[in-house]
Regions:
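Short Pro/Gly-enriched beta-strand edge/turn motifs at strand-loop
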Residues: 1-7
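N-terminal nucleophile
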Residues: 2, 13-14, 80-81
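A broad, low-specificity signal marking well-ordered, structured residues that form hydrophobic/aromatic
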Residues: 4, 29, 57
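Short Gly/Pro-enriched turn/cap motifs at secondary-structure boundaries
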Residues: 8-12
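A short, structured beta-strand/loop element
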Residues: 14-54
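Helix-rich interaction surfaces within compact, conserved domain-sized segments
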Residues: 43-81
Length: 81
């Protein structure tokens, strides 16, 4: 698997921070974010199950432009950025 790095939280010190990648082979977005606490996980479970093989992470709103870029990259892989 070859991940294509898209971006990092712009307010970061480059360590231990939210990041976004695209897996072009599997056509998936990959996120590193802050782990959800029990309270947030419980709120998520109120709309459906949270299986053991899934995780809830937080991504700051200031990364919206990076998320859009990742969506565009996976939807249009032929366009070089």
């Amino acid at each position: 698997m070859a991940l294509r790095f898209i971006g990092i939280d712009p307010d970061t010190d480059e360590h231990n921070c939210p990041r976004v990648w695209v897996d072009d082979e599997k056509k998936e977005l990959v996120f590193q974010g802050w782990k959800a606490g029990k309270e947030l996980e419980d709120e998520v479970r109120s709309t459906g199950p949270l299986p053991d093989y899934e995780a809830v992470v937080r991504i700051p709103a200031r990364m919206v432009h990076i998320l859009r870029e990742a969506c565009d990259a996976i939807e249009h892989p032929d366009v070089v950025r």
